[in-house]
Amino acid sequence: SMLLLLICTITAQAQEYHVETPGTLQEVIGPGAEELTRIRVTGTLNDRDIAFLHRLCWPSKPKPKGMKYENYLKMAMEKEDTLKPCLRYLDMEDARMVNDALPARAFDGSFIRDYKLPKTLKKIGESAFTCNVFLKELIIPESVEEIGRNLLFFSIKVEKVRFPDNLEVMNDFLCAECWKLKEVNIPSKVREIYSGIFNGCPKA
């Protein structure tokens, strides 16, 4: 049982990778990336690294045109256990993004259950966490000043979102169709709130 305990502890710990040169995360991780369930990344990342991370937590194909979102989500959730890649926990807290910006659709449709975002992040592109069907909580770092529209659109299990106090503009549909959302803050510095932020959120 001691051995079993040891194995469980090892599995629960995140593998750690340091990126010295932006754009080289794939080379730093090397073979076997698709087997990883938890990783912690430090150093400096660019959009190429984010695209690679996205592939590691994005087993479903993009939503076909014309398919209803509900049907797409159902299909994605049914496939979770049958498809690799396996990444479910991603800690980027001590990494830095080039330009301090997360690109649009960075983790659209991903199967991540827990993100820790870079604590120096200033901007999050639109639809960054759309259709994240297993995510329950998203804490956005206090450093973030700008968030694109559709942030968590159809992330149907999200219960809690924490926006940074310095956010001045809340863009369209930030949390639309987050059916379980019940805990969310309106930042103290907000001066503009756009439409449909909490559309389809009966509990928010």
Tell me what each language-model feature is:
Residues T9-T11, G125, C201:
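Short, intrinsically disordered, low-complexity terminal segments
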Residues P103-A106, G125-A128, G148-L151, N171-L174, ...:
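Consensus positions within tandem repeat domains that build extended binding/scaffold surfaces
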Residues E16-E20, T37-L45, K65-A101, S110-K123, ...:
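Structural signature of tandem-repeat unit edges
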Residues I29-G30, D108, F153:
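Ankyrin-repeat helical core positions
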Residues I50-S60, A101-S110:
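Extracellular beta-strand-rich solenoid/capping regions of secreted or surface-exposed proteins
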Residues S1-Q15:
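Bacterial Sec-dependent N-terminal signal peptides
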Residues A14-H54:
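N-terminal segments that cap or nucleate solenoid repeat domains
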